[in-house]
Amino acid sequence: MATPKRRMSRANTRSRRSQWKATKAELVGVTVGGQKHKVPRRLLKAARLGLIDLDRR
């Protein structure tokens, strides 16, 4: 693991952290039981198999 050679100032640390942004999950349309829902792509298979409750929102 990389270790810093010098201490990083508080201002530099906070400005570096502020650049990090979370990305929104890409929603994909899926039809389950005749109803259309939008779910993240990683949950698509679970939604089709009925492993997650899509009516609870």
UniProtKB/Swiss-Prot annotation:
Residues 1-21 are annotated as: Disordered. Keywords: Ribonucleoprotein, Ribosomal protein. Residues 1-19 have a biased composition (Basic residues). GO terms for cellular component: large ribosomal subunit. One of its GO terms (molecular function) is structural constituent of ribosome. GO terms for biological process: translation. It holds the Pfam family Ribosomal_L32p. InterPro entries: Ribosomal_bL32, Ribosomal_zn-bd. The keyword Ligase does not apply. It comes from the Bacteria. SUPFAM superfamilies: Zn-binding ribosomal proteins. Belongs to the bacterial ribosomal protein bL32 family. This is Large ribosomal subunit protein bL32. It comes from Mycobacterium ulcerans (strain Agy99). The gene is rpmF.
